C-alpha cells in the first residue's frame, strides 16, 4: 500500500500565489531534477480541477517535454502514472490513464492507495486541505522557494491541526529547501 503524499512548491510566506506557479520558474530546473527521482516511486497522482488542468500539459503539449532532459523524464514519468481528478465541475478528462471522481471520498482514496503500484501524491492546496481534514495524508513534502508572494492561496489551510515529524530536508544551490514531514497521530480539534 502506498503512502499519500502532499507535495508542492511554496513561497517562504506560505502562499502559492493564485494557482499560477510561474513564480517558481527560476527554481524549476533543480527542483525538476530532484522531483523526477522521487516521482518515479509514484503510481498515482490525485488532483483537483485546477491542478489537473495545469499538469495536463505534460501530455498534451510536447513542447513542455522538449525544454530539457529532466522535463522529458518528468513527462514520461507523469504519463506512465495513473491520475484521478476530483471535480464537480470538470466535464471530462483528456489525458490517458486518468479518471474523474466527483468528490473526494475517504473510501475511494483508501482504495487508490491500496491498489497503487507505488506512493500516491495529492496536489492542489484545496484538495490537500480536504484530505488532511479527512486524515488521509501520510506525508507533507514542501519545496520552500526563496520568494515572498505577499498573498494568494495558502499552501496549508487554516482550521486543520496536525502534528508532523521532520523526516528529511535537502538544501539546493538555488536556495530551495525540500522538507519532508511524516504526519503523526490523528486530526487534532
PLM region descriptions:
Residues 1-189:
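Enzymes that bind and transform nitrogen-containing heteroaromatic metabolites
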Amino acid at each position: 500500500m502506498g503512502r499519500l503524499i502532499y507535495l508542492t512548491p511554496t513561497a517562504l510566506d506560505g502562499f502559492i500565489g493564485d494557482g499560477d506557479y510561474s513564480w517558481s520558474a527560476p527554481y524549476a530546473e533543480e527542483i525538476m531534477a530532484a522531483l523526477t527521482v522521487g516521482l518515479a516511486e509514484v503510481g498515482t497522482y490525485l488532483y483537483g480541477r485546477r491542478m489537473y488542468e495545469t499538469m495536463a500539459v505534460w501530455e498534451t503539449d510536447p513542447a513542455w517535454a522538449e525544454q530539457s532532459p529532466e522535463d522529458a523524464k518528468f513527462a514520461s514519468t507523469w504519463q506512465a502514472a495513473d491520475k484521478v481528478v476530483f471535480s464537480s465541475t470538470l466535464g471530462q478528462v483528456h489525458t490517458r490513464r486518468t479518471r474523474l471522481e466527483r468528490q473526494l471520498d475517504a473510501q475511494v482514496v483508501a482504495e487508490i492507495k491500496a491498489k497503487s503500484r507505488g506512493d500516491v501524491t495529492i496536489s492542489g492546496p484545496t484538495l490537500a486541505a480536504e484530505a488532511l481534514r479527512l486524515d488521509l495524508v501520510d506525508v507533507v513534502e514542501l519545496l520552500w522557494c526563496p520568494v515572498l508572494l505577499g498573498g494568494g492561496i495558502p499552501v496549508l489551510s487554516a482550521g486543520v491541526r496536525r502534528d508532523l515529524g521532520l523526516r528529511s530536508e535537502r538544501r539546493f544551490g538555488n536556495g530551495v529547501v525540500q522538507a519532508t514531514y511524516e504526519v503523526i497521530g490523528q486530526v487534532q480539534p
